Amino acid sequence: AATHDVTLIEAAGRLGGHARTVMAGKRGDQPVDTGFIVFNYANYPQLTAMFDDLGVPVVKSDMSFGASVMGGRMEYGLASLRAVFAQTRNIANPRFLRMLRDVMRFNARALDTAQDSNMTIGGLLEALGTGPWFRDYYLLPLSGAIWSTPKDRILDFPADAMIRFFENHALLSHTGQHQWYTVQGGSIEYVRRV
């Protein structure tokens, strides 16, 4: 803030809000972020400009999603077709295949269907006619991982806001995401510079 006076107000005893790095590992020398983990240049231009101004070191990061549900009886990932069918028995599992069909339907139709600002995610799933496997083994775990929210609360989220987030972060596409980055040394590195 070369031309402005800035006052930081923080409720906690430390600065950073959800940017929290803890040291882990056998020697306690491995930084692990527990809140703010990744960002991309497409969706966070102000943050990335601040990082550039402050000289915050960043590195590319891989972001993918995988799920292990029902005590490991059903597992899959989204990084590749091989990951989707990590358990080859799912190739012949009609419920798993319907879940994949519902993923494609959701990705294709959610943006147009979620125009009503009063619609919840639960209402959106009903309107799209997706099945319980899609809800329980795809959307709820994915959304819960993104927002660190218990699965039982996701269905009450406003559909339009969540679907816009998915669209902005290329989560409604099966052709790829934005390149993700992380702060080298953990988010504490940018908090120290602020």
Give the positions of each predicted feature.
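Short intrinsically disordered, low-complexity coil segments enriched in acidic
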Residues: 1-8, 133, 150, 192-193
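Glycine-rich FAD pyrophosphate-binding loop
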Residues: 2-25
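Conserved donor sugar-nucleotide recognition element shared by glycan-biosynthetic enzymes
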Residues: 18-19, 158-159, 187
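Short glycine/proline- and charge-enriched loop/turn segments
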Residues: 24-33, 173
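Mobile amphipathic helical/loop "lid" adjacent to a hydrophobic cofactor/ligand pocket
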Residues: 30, 41-168
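Active-site rim elements
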Residues: 33-37, 109-113, 178-182
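Helical element adjacent to the flavin cofactor pocket in flavoenzyme catalytic cores
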Residues: 164-194
